């Protein structure tokens, strides 16, 4: 098919779906950069504490996001098959699952907060540990609100509404920055102030998204939340997609924790440098990640409509878009690296290491990132989640984690070892996913009636 009018999604539809997602991700990362710069003025120990705790927080956030994405894929396929009733039933179960799971995780983290931090980051300096405990206390309370927002935002995107999550996120991020300014600088609360501001902004997101989904003019309308009861068949379908993706994301974060534990032995300067580099690397990937998130909605609806050739077409099309986004983003972020380290008040040694790592990323990321991620987004939307989980976990542990630990502990490399391992992981994973995509075996799954 070469005529764009023959496709389920026109170029205009794609732009309307992707641009808000890309802008939302970009602004969130920019706000994260500003957030870190604000915290960095408190001191290197504060930056290190936020970085260490966020490696745990992101583990939880990624797991919750994967479950929500599983529900969104289910909703997308129901919408593609012209079954809005099924989409609405699935959406209600997504909210139920996310609420129960996020509250449970928050409670566990609250009870095990101190021993967990000491077990993972026991070798850090006392000041960093104290700041970490204060920061984690407030951020763990936000997990249920993250779960509710993720559920709502994913459901909105499943019905082609990516503008609403973007708007909510924009307002939330500015509230977070404003809260930081008041609590960190005005009241001198340090990392605790940053955490409280984050908690408040996430509560805002959850409340607004719940209200927004009550609109009966939408394809999916979720109201009377108190009447939601378990539908075990739908819950199993949500978890069929969500659990493998959650394990994949969680294993990825466990790997980052293992790496972070190794980096934490290199000293506060290395921890701070790697923390800022992580933010910059995330920033140069947000546009392409937005393409991947939108691709799940597109492929999900194609599969639901029984148009598998369309799914293949869109994965190829959006992979090219993601590659262009990666190249441009890497160049822009590299140009901003030195100004950010200066404005953030980083120590000279940390700034030097940060610049070197960002240069390495700018060279290597455009080579391998797209093939290792974008086709996988589409294949997961078709239900091919177990293969993605196995491939990603094996590659991450065998390449990323092993290389980093080997280079740091045996050969005496600094934090640059993290990114050498990352490049190896991306390369291997990209090769495997490319073979899987061209085999078309990922099209043989059925997750809706």
Located regions from the model:
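Short alpha-helical transmembrane segments in multi-pass integral membrane proteins
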Residues: 1-21, 75-142, 186-243, 299-365, ...
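Residue-level hotspots within the lipid-embedded alpha helices of multi-pass solute transporters
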Residues: 25-29, 62, 102, 106, ...
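N-terminal transmembrane alpha-helices
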Residues: 5-37, 41-42, 58-70, 74, ...
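Small-residue hotspots at the loop-to-helix junctions and early N-terminal turns
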Residues: 44-55, 132, 136, 195, ...
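Helix-terminus/linker motif at the lipid-water interface of multi-pass membrane proteins
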Residues: 26, 30-48, 117-126, 182-189, ...
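Short runs within selected transmembrane alpha-helices of multi-pass transporters and secretion channels
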Residues: 68, 138-157, 165-173, 194-209, ...
């Amino acid at each position: 098919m070469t005529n764009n009018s023959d496709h389920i999604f026109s170029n205009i539809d794609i732009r309307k779906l992707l641009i808000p997602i890309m802008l939302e991700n970009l602004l969130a990362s920019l706000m994260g950069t500003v957030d870190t710069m604000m915290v960095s003025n408190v001191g290197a120990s504060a930056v290190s504490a936020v970085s260490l705790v966020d490696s745990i927080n992101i583990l939880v956030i990624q797991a919750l996001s994967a479950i929500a994405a599983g529900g969104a894929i289910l909703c997308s396929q129901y919408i593609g098959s012209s079954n809005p009733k099924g989409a609405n039933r699935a959406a209600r179960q997504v909210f139920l699952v996310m609420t129960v799971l996020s509250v449970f995780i928050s409670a566990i983290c609250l009870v095990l907060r101190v021993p967990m931090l000491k077990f993972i980051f026991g070798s850090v300096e006392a000041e960093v540990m104290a700041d970490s405990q204060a920061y984690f206390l407030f951020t763990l309370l936000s997990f249920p609100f993250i779960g509710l927002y993720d559920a709502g935002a994913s459901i909105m995107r499943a019905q082609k509404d990516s503008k609403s999550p973007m708007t909510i996120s924009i307002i939330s991020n500015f509230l977070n920055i404003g809260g930081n300014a008041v609590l960190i600088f005005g009241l001198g609360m340090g990392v605790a102030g940053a955490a409280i501001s984050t908690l408040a902004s996430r509560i805002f997101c959850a409340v607004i998204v719940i209200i927004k989904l009550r609109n009966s003019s939408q394809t999916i309308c979720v109201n009377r939340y108190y009447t939601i009861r378990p539908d075990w068949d739908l819950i199993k379908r949500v978890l069929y997609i969500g659990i493998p993706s959650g394990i994949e994301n969680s294993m990825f974060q466990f790997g980052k924790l293992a790496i972070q534990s190794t980096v934490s032995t290199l000293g506060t300067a290395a921890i701070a440098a790697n923390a800022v580099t992580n933010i910059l690397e995330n920033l140069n990937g947000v546009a392409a990640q937005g393409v991947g998130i939108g691709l799940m909605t597109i492929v999900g609806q194609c599969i639901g409509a029984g148009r598998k050739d369309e799914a293949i077409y869109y994965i190829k099309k959006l992979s090219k878009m993601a590659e262009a986004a990666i190249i441009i983003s890497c160049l822009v972020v590299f140009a901003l690296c030195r100004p950010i380290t200066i404005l953030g008040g980083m120590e000279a040694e940390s700034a030097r290491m940060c610049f070197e790592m960002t240069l390495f990323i700018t060279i290597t990321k455009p080579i391998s990132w797209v093939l290792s991620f974008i086709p996988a987004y589409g294949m997961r939307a078709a239900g091919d989640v177990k293969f993605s989980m196995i491939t990603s976990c094996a590659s991450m542990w065998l390449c990323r984690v092993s290389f980093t630990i080997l280079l740091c502990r045996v050969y005496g490399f600094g934090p640059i070892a993290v990114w050498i391992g990352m490049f190896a992981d991306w390369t291997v994973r990209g090769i495997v996913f490319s073979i899987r995509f061209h085999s078309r075996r990922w099209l043989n799954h059925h997750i809706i009636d």
